[in-house]
Structures are given as C-alpha cells and as structure tokens.
Amino acid sequence: MRHGTHTGSNPYAEAYVEVTAGGLAETDLAADPIEQFRRWLADAIRYNLPEPTAMVVATADADGRPSSRHVLLKSVDDGFVFFTNYRSRKGRDLSENPSASLCFPWFAIGRQVVVLGTVTKVTREETEEYFASRPRDSQCGAWSSENQSSVVPSRAWLDERYAEVAQRFAGVEHIPPPPFWGGFRVIPETVEFWQARPARMHDRLRYRRTADGERPWIIERLSP
C-alpha cells in the first residue's frame, strides 16, 4: 500500500510516498544473487512496472569524478549485461576505471536492487548477436551517434547524420555493429536487495562474494 506520510510546506516532504510491503528474511533468499535477481525481475514484470529492466549505471573516471545514467539491462548470466557506445562518457569511464554500480529502482513495489562490480567487455560475437536483434532504425542510430556524449551543432545536424547512415545501408540486408559499439558485463562483487518496510525500518540484505569455493556468497543484513 502507498500513502503520503508528511505534511507542511516542504515540497520534497510532500512528495514522499511510503510503500508498505511484506518483509524480506534471509530464509526468503536464493543461495545465489543472480537467481534472486531473476525472481525479483520476474515480479517487476508481473506487476507491469514501466521499464522493469531500466537501471541506473554509475561510473567514475580516472580522477574519481562520477556520472550516472539510465540504461536497459539486456541479459543476466554470471553478470549484468548492457550495450552502449564505447566512446560515450560511460564507455570512456569504464576503459579508465572498470568498476560500476547498478541500481534497479522498483519503488512502485517497494524494492530496489543495488549491484557493485567489476566490468569487462563482452565478446564481439555477443555484440554481433545482440545487434542483429535490434530494429533497423536503432542499428542506424548506433552508427549515426559515432561520438556519443560529444557536443553537436543542432538537432538538424543529428537528423542529417541519421539520413546519411540510412542511405549508406539502404541496400545492406544485415547491418553490422559499429566498431565503436558493444557490450559490457558487470560481474557482481556485492548485490543488495532492499525491501521497503514501515517507519523506514527497511530490510536490506546483501550478498558479498567470498574466496571460498564451497560458499561463494555470504548474505549479510545491513542497518536501514
């Protein structure tokens, strides 16, 4: 159930909406965080949350300056996979500092998942397979934005670039991925599952990777 909990003149306080839901106990969790994530993602999809695979990807450059943006999760295996322009700010950050944090904000059902991990590029074969599944206009868009995150003169300039790319590939049945475009895989070191509870006494359970082959993950409860 969702309900407002603050009154007064502070607009930020007025905007706060509390979500009450069932608790989250250690015994509720799968032994592996990837399996637990799949369960919660299935719940987010079942509840028809908008863009349930949208996540905030936070990176930092070599000097520690952070940046963040929303990106769509494309697959989950031993890590969390997304695709982007390698020349974008996040691509440059990850080439200098291959660590990232992900946040899945499923606040409508009182949940969020926060991942911290190291980042590697996916294979070119994985990139080609995913790129082939994209709509043709999105493929052209990837080629059009050769220097993502750079300053451009105008919207008209962007539209002209797209038209040029679409014309270039007009007779090509299968558009290949650009050499500056591909995927990253975030290999988790910690994964926190956050469940909203009344009075801000939220449940926070974190998986932490260990060097123990027989017990690769430890589950810890964090103070709310």
Swiss-Prot record:
Description of how the protein assembles with itself and partners: Homodimer.
Catalysed reactions listed for this entry: pyridoxamine 5'-phosphate + O2 + H2O = pyridoxal 5'-phosphate + H2O2 + NH4(+); pyridoxine 5'-phosphate + O2 = pyridoxal 5'-phosphate + H2O2
Lineage: Bacteria, Bacillati, Actinomycetota, Actinomycetes, Acidothermales
UniProt cross-references to PROSITE patterns, sorted A to Z: PYRIDOX_OXIDASE (PS01064)
EC assignment: 1.4.3.5
Secretion signal span: none
Domain of life, source organism: Bacteria
Role according to the record: Catalyzes the oxidation of either pyridoxine 5'-phosphate (PNP) or pyridoxamine 5'-phosphate (PMP) into pyridoxal 5'-phosphate (PLP).
Pfam family, one: PNP_phzG_C
Pathway: Cofactor metabolism; pyridoxal 5'-phosphate salvage; pyridoxal 5'-phosphate from pyridoxamine 5'-phosphate: step 1/1; Cofactor metabolism; pyridoxal 5'-phosphate salvage; pyridoxal 5'-phosphate from pyridoxine 5'-phosphate: step 1/1
Alphabetically ordered keywords of this record: Flavoprotein, FMN, Oxidoreductase, Pyridoxine biosynthesis
Names of required cofactors: FMN
Gene label: pdxH
InterPro entries with a match to the protein in the record: Pyridox_Oxase (IPR000659), Pyridox_Oxase_CS (IPR019740), Pyridox_Oxase_N (IPR011576), Pyridoxamine_oxidase_dimer_C (IPR019576), Split_barrel_FMN-bd (IPR012349)
Residues that, per the record, bind FMN: 69-74, 83-84, 89-90, 112, 148-149, 194, 204
GO aspect biological process, one term: pyridoxine biosynthetic process
Binding site for substrate: 74, 130, 134, 138, 200-202
Family indicated by similarity: Belongs to the pyridoxamine 5'-phosphate oxidase family.
Cofactor note: Binds 1 FMN per subunit.
Cross-referenced NCBIfam families: pdxH (TIGR00558), PRK05679.1 (NF004231)
Listed name of the protein: Pyridoxine/pyridoxamine 5'-phosphate oxidase
A GO MF term: FMN binding
Native species: Acidothermus cellulolyticus (strain ATCC 43068 / DSM 8971 / 11B)
